[in-house]
Amino acid sequence: MGEIKVSPDYNWFRSTVPLKKIIVDDDDSKIWSLYDAGPRSIRCPLIFLPPVSGTADVFFQQILALTGWGYRVIALQYPVYWDHLEFCDGFRKLLDHLQLDKVHLFGASLGGFLAQKFAEYTHKSPRVHSLILCNAFSDTSIFNQTWTANSFWLMPAFMLKKIVLGNFSSGPVDPMMADAIDFMVDRLESLGQSELASRLTLNCQNSYVEPHKIRDIPVTIMDIHLLQFHGTKYAAIDPSVVSAEELDVQKGQLDLSQEEP
């Protein structure tokens, strides 16, 4: 349990890359938290936007790897914003503050949706050079919770965390995925009620991405492939190309992970 949080890589990252806090709105309570690593001479960095449960440091492994190859990487944590236009306006101000005219955006889940909304928001004066979308979506209606979006601010923190945790895998997973889930649960615990409520509101508020406004932007789509979905209709790979031997190995790995205390 908690292997990632106590790992040498994570501790080295936290001790060498400073967490910056920046205010760009008139409301001083709206604070952007970010890690900015890599050569400052690069004016078109890769910016990571986290999911509902994520903080800026959930991307520490990507930051360490990419900066080692010479990239400039910025990982963000959002302030409390209650609608997509407010977020886009705040993010634009942040880029202006950082003196970044063009950026590459990587977004996971909610982060991927917000990345698309920002690209849409700036389509007349483009700020997004490319999009990398991991388990993202382009229409909030897929969650069937648009009718509850305006009530999240009323809910206590424990109830909001329960909603988010309901999306985490509860079945047997491979050890690396189990460590990742533990780490994300730990990061979730660090978020306050208003942070969670605002993120869930952005995640479920009735909205969609207008495709014609981002059609000229290169997009890379990443789909996470979990072992328990291997060979099923939920897999990222066509089940017809999965061999019986692979399925036997997968079943054995999951059985072992389930037996471990």
Swiss-Prot record:
Matches recorded under Pfam families: Abhydrolase_1
Keywords assigned: Cytoplasm, Phosphoprotein
Gene3D superfamilies xrefs: alpha/beta hydrolase
The keyword Cytoplasm appears for this protein: yes
Residues carrying Phosphoserine: S257
Localisation: Cytoplasm
Single annotated GO MF: CD4 receptor binding
Cellular component per GO, a single term: trans-Golgi network transport vesicle
All residue ranges annotated as the AB hydrolase-1 domain in the record: 87-159
GO BP field: collateral sprouting; epidermal growth factor receptor signaling pathway; gene expression; limb development; locomotory behavior; neuromuscular process; neuron maturation; response to epidermal growth factor
Functional description taken from the UniProt entry: May play a role as a negative regulatory factor in CD4-dependent T-cell activation.
Family designation: Belongs to the AB hydrolase superfamily.
Subunit structure: Interacts with CD4. Interacts with ALDH16A1.
Protein name: Maspardin
Gene from which the chain derives: Spg21
